[in-house]
Amino acid sequence: MLKKSLAALALGTALLSAGQAMAADYVIDKEGQHAFVDFKISHLGYSFIHGTFKDWDGTFSFDAAKPEASKINVELKTASLFTNHAERDKHISSKDFLDVAKYPEAKFVSTAVKSTGEKTADVTGDLTLHGVTKPIVIKATFNGEGKDPWGGYRAGFNGTSTLNLNDFGIKGPGPTSQTLDLDITFEGVQKK
């Protein structure tokens, strides 16, 4: 009788454990250059300026079986802005726009994840930029996950969002320069 009870308990525990999805924790792989925050903004309505932020990092938790339980936290150094033009970078970093001396960091903290397809989701979160915190939605795509050649385990994503800079107290030189398109791509390495 005791053997049957122990066997039933072991089987029940195994089934319960198998039925519960476990989110894994990841660190965004910026050291391996597998992480990018790129942007595009209109230049006076005539063309587009493309740029990136070189210094940012973050963490996330993810389980492909239960993406709604995912969470992400990202911090970005605003002074790491790069548009391949030193004078323009200096101007965008000045008090006229980002004011990186006063606001050296931008931060995103997710508050909800809603699946929109087999590998897509809307990630809602609070973005703090230029001293203002506002909710935004990132349209995210899960690119895949698996073992890497160095003994780790990775998961990769990309996402897009559009920001109205006026919402964050940043004034552009005209109405066409108020909308900034974000394109985010990253791999995370699972914490051991």
Curated annotation (Swiss-Prot):
Record carries keyword Signal: yes
GO cellular component: periplasmic space
Listed InterPro entries: Lipid/polyisoprenoid-bd_YceI, TTHA0802/YceI-like_sf, UPF0312/YceI
Location in the cell: Periplasm
Keyword Repeat: no
Alphabetical keyword list: Periplasm, Signal
Signal peptide: 1-23
Family classification: Belongs to the UPF0312 family. Type 1 subfamily.
UniProt protein name: UPF0312 protein PSPTO_5071
Organism expressing this protein natively: Pseudomonas syringae pv. tomato (strain ATCC BAA-871 / DC3000)
